[in-house]
Swiss-Prot record:
Pfam families attached to this UniProt entry: Fer4_NifH (PF00142)
Organism of this sequence: Azobacteroides pseudotrichonymphae genomovar. CFP2
Molecular function GO labels: 4 iron, 4 sulfur cluster binding; ATP binding; metal ion binding; nitrogenase activity
Protein name, as recorded: Nitrogenase iron protein
Chain residues that bind ATP: G8, K9, G10, G11, I12, G13, K14, S15
Class of this enzyme: oxidoreductase
Classification of source organism: Bacteria, Pseudomonadati, Bacteroidota, Bacteroidia, Bacteroidales
Named cofactor requirement(s): [4Fe-4S] cluster
Length: 274
């Protein structure tokens, strides 16, 4: 079983990219569980066709300790297992702590047991804030592979570089490795070349460049992944390609994060900063 965490700055398209990639993997016959680690609890919406899923933390609050696996796990597109950790009430408590509680509960309830025959577990994690809780999937060995969703925008690259600092730190003492950057295009000038160069400087790869296409929004409005909503569209093939590249990826590295100066020099070199 491969345990993969998808990180990236808020609003970059992590949840969309994760769910569309998972749709590509299950279409290939892989058995996948998705664990949403974002307080917004929108990491499985497209796989579940918009059914609002009760989060692990809400279930624990309502039911106490007497929780069964089926109370927190729903079956989505092509039998994908879907879980949302959820978060505390706004302004109270720590969202990162919720992730820790959720993953521990899933382990106790046997979600990862051999009889589930999972090929993949995906953690979709809020990534601007690399606080202890959000870093938990990579800190405590819950995920061995990380993919960072970014774009050619300055803040997306800044967040990606910060996430690499975490992987660098925990990779030295554990098993976590960076599998690559996924560029979710924002149509920035020279974007593919810049993210390719950024990846090279980090010591990794841009595993795929996902072009911007309105079909993604059309599918989301219909509460589906592109592969589910428009399987013959070229954008569906982009996600199939990304899924296949992840499925075959063997390049796992401890990244070397850039200094702020190096990052700014890269942005200036590609004309993003003056």
């Amino acid at each position: 079983m491969r345990k993969i965490a998808i990180y990236g700055k808020g609003g970059i398209g992590k949840s969309t990219t994760t769910q569309n990639t998972v749709a590509g993997l299950v279409e290939m016959g892989r058995k996948v569980m998705v664990v949403g680690c974002d307080p917004k609890a929108d990491s499985t919406r497209l796989l579940l066709h918009g059914l609002a899923q009760k989060t692990v933390l809400d279930t624990l609050r309502d039911e106490g300790e007497d929780v069964e696996l089926e109370d927190v796990m729903k079956k989505g597109f092509k039998d994908t297992s879907c879980v949302e950790s959820g978060g505390p009430e706004p302004g109270v408590g720590c969202a990162g702590r919720g992730i820790i509680t959720s993953i521990n509960l899933l382990e106790q309830l046997g979600a990862y047991d051999d009889d589930k025959q999972l090929d993949y577990v995906f953690y979709d994690v809020l990534g601007d804030v690399v606080c202890g809780g959000f870093a938990m999937p990579i800190r405590d060995g819950k995920a061995q592979e990380v993919y960072i969703v970014c774009s050619g925008e300055m803040m997306a690259m800044y967040a990606a570089n910060n996430i690499c600092k975490s992987i660098h730190k925990f990779g030295k003492v554990g098993d976590v490795r960076l599998g690559g950057l996924i560029c979710n295009s924002r149509k920035v000038d020279n974007e593919a070349n810049m993210i390719g160069e950024f990846a090279k400087k980090l010591g990794t790869q841009m595993i795929h460049f996902v072009p911007r296409d309105n079909m993604v929004q059309h599918a989301e409005i219909n509460r589906k992944t592109v592969i589910d909503y428009a399987p013959d569209h070229s954008q569906a093939d982009e996600y199939r390609t990304l899924a296949s590249k992840i499925d075959n990826n063997t390049m796992m590295v401890i990244p070397n994060p850039l200094s702020i100066q190096e990052l700014e020099d890269l942005l200036i070199g590609f004309g993003i900063m003056n």
